[in-house]
């Protein structure tokens, strides 16, 4: 049995959960999220607490039920508080700008790279070098942040590139040269 799956998901009165045949819909002050459910997972709600239980004891089902509990918990946190990822641009001349809802990055290429913000994601820029991605879906916020970082990941010699705020980049020594 999954240790995470056994834990209940507690939510406030601001959050409403509705279970259809194959879906769970979580509504809160920041928005609404939906998740398709497996037939092998049983979900019960009792006084603002959600319980996830496996229907059978098959190994695949036991692996899934902890994952479902974690995803539903992330949905509850997302519709109440939301999620945020911060990226920083390091390098001479590296800067970010907003053009409407799109993000334009100047990161050493001959042209600016433009990223369109999908629905449900807000992108903000601080001091031209910090990009803030926020939204209610933890998965989508993380995926967009990862896509932006992959445009110019930090290189190991000088550390130039796009990185998460607080990310440690291991640096290499340059070549020794002639003596």
From Swiss-Prot:
SUPFAM superfamilies per UniProt: Ribosomal protein L6
Keyword set includes Plastid: yes
InterPro entries linked: Ribosomal_uL6-like (IPR000702), Ribosomal_uL6-like_a/b-dom_sf (IPR036789), Ribosomal_uL6_a/b-dom (IPR020040), Ribosomal_uL6_bac-type (IPR019906), Ribosomal_uL6_CS (IPR002358)
Superkingdom: Eukaryota
Compartment annotation: Plastid, Chloroplast
Alphabetized GO MF terms: rRNA binding; structural constituent of ribosome
Keywords for the protein's UniProt record, in alphabetical order: Chloroplast, Plastid, Ribonucleoprotein, Ribosomal protein, RNA-binding, rRNA-binding
GO BP annotation list: cytoplasmic translation
GO cellular component: chloroplast; cytosolic large ribosomal subunit
Function: Binds 23S rRNA.
Subunit field text: Part of the 50S ribosomal subunit.
Family the entry assigns: Belongs to the universal ribosomal protein uL6 family.
Name the UniProt record assigns to this protein: Large ribosomal subunit protein uL6c
Organism: Guillardia theta
Gene that encodes it: rpl6
């Amino acid at each position: 049995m999954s240790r995470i799956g056994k834990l209940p998901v507690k939510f406030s009165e601001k959050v409403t959960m509705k279970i259809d045949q194959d879906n769970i819909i979580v509504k809160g002050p920041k928005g609404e999220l939906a998740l398709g459910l497996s037939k092998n997972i049983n979900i019960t709600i009792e006084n603002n607490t959600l319980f996830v239980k496996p229907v059978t004891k098959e190994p695949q089902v036991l692996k899934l039920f902890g994952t479902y509990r974690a995803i539903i918990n992330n949905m509850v946190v997302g519709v109440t508080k939301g999620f945020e990822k911060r990226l920083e641009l390091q390098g001479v001349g590296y800067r970010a700008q907003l053009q409407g809802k799109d993000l334009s990055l100047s990161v050493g290429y001959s042209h600016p790279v433009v990223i369109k913000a999908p629905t449900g994601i807000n992108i903000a820029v601080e001091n031209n070098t910090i990009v803030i991605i926020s939204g209610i879906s933890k998965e989508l916020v993380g995926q967009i942040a990862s896509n932006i970082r992959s445009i110019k990941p930090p290189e190991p010699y000088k550390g130039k590139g796009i990185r998460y705020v607080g990310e440690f980049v291991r640096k290499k020594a340059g070549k020794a040269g002639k003596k």
